[in-house]
């Protein structure tokens, strides 16, 4: 009598990791149905318990079916769970930053074993804290790709996501006020500068010349341009050109005396103190003439009458001209009993008296209406 034949059909589990536990054999069919089934994993000991699989793995299962009066049969199958595709999602995939302000986004899944790189660290860098990625702008404007990568694990493949960071340079707020005033003999800064950020580098150029970090100053009357340039890494350089003006001051002029009387043929003098060189002239040279030596003004009588001596302090680099007046009266000498004997004289013979000739005990002299 021959043993019966057992029919054994088995379907192994082959799938992708899904976090669920599965029978190692997804289907098993045996005839007769009451045959005894035993399982061996990778050639190990047999057990009546169905093997399970959950995590990514690969192994063999041998199934043995037996029953009294039947020939024992077996089959070996390969069980396999493949890695699932890694999961990586970002709350944002692009953003614009203006130096020095940063921005951030979150990783919504799988924050373990994450690495972050930047395509250009001069433009932007990134760091991870928990599930938050902070993007910091560099000092160079442009675009940088922030790449987030999860490492391969037992059950998941590596996954990559990218964030495009656009970085703009920051803005410098530059406010410049030029000096405008009247000459006062003191030195002044050519401009007043206010800048944000306060540590920006400030440079100055006078009339388009070479830049210098030294603040230009102004004392004397002048007019010139100052270009102020503010710069800092990560910021757009800003500049502005302003005109500096120092105007002439009003001239000053004072006289030691402002009027006088001269008895012909005498002279008189006074001093003039001014902000420029001194000159003078007479309104009537038939009465008086004037000369200047340094700051001394000498008035010489010519004939009886009145004249105005105009004194001028000249315009110069820092002062406007200034004038002042000196009033002079010229008189002849008064005849007295000590003047001697006087005779009328017609010097040029035209019938008009030109003067009087005086004679005393000591000398003889002639006064000819302005001549002696």
Q: Can you annotate each of these PLM segments?
A:
Residues 19, 346-357, 365, 372:
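Acidic, glycine-anchored loop motifs typical of Ca2+
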Residues 332-345:
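An edge-strand/N-cap motif at the start of beta-rich repeat modules
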Residues 1-333:
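Solvent-exposed beta-strand/loop surfaces, strongest in extracytoplasmic domains of secreted
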């Amino acid at each position: 009598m021959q043993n019966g034949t057992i029919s054994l059909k088995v379907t192994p589990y082959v799938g992708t990791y899904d976090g669920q536990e599965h029978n190692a054999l997804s289907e098993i069919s045996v005839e007769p149905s009451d045959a005894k089934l035993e399982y061996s994993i990778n050639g190990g000991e047999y057990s009546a318990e169905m093997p399970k699989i959950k995590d990514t793995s690969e192994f063999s299962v041998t199934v043995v079916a037996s029953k009294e009066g039947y020939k024992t049969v077996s089959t070996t199958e390969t069980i396999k769970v493949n890695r699932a595709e890694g999961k990586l999602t970002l709350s944002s995939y692009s953003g614009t930053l203006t130096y020095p302000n940063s921005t951030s986004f979150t990783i919504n899944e799988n924050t373990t074993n994450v690495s972050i790189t930047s395509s250009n660290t001069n433009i932007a860098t990134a760091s991870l804290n928990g599930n938050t990625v902070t993007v910091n702008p560099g000092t160079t404007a442009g675009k940088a790709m922030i790449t987030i990568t999860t490492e391969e694990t037992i059950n998941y493949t590596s996954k990559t996501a990218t964030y495009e960071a656009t970085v703009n340079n920051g803005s410098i707020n530059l406010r410049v006020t030029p000096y405008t005033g009247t000459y006062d003999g003191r030195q002044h800064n050519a401009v007043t500068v206010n800048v944000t950020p306060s540590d920006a580098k400030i440079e100055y150029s006078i009339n388009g010349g070479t830049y210098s970090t030294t603040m230009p100053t102004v004392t004397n009357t002048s007019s010139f341009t100052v270009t102020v340039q503010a710069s800092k890494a990560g910021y757009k350089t800003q500049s502005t050109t302003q005109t500096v003006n120092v105007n002439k001051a009003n001239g000053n002029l004072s006289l030691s005396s402002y009027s006088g009387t001269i008895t012909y043929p005498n002279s008189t003098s006074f001093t003039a103190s001014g902000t420029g060189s001194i000159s003078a002239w007479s309104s009537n040279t038939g009465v008086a003439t004037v000369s200047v030596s340094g700051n001394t003004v000498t008035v010489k009588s010519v004939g009886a009458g009145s004249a105005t001596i105009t004194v001028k302090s000249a315009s110069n680099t820092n002062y406007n001209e200034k004038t002042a007046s000196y009033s002079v009266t010229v008189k002849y000498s008064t005849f007295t009993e000590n003047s001697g004997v006087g005779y009328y004289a017609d010097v040029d013979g035209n019938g008009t008296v030109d003067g009087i000739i005086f004679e005393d005990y000591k000398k003889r002299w002639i006064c000819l209406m302005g001549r002696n």
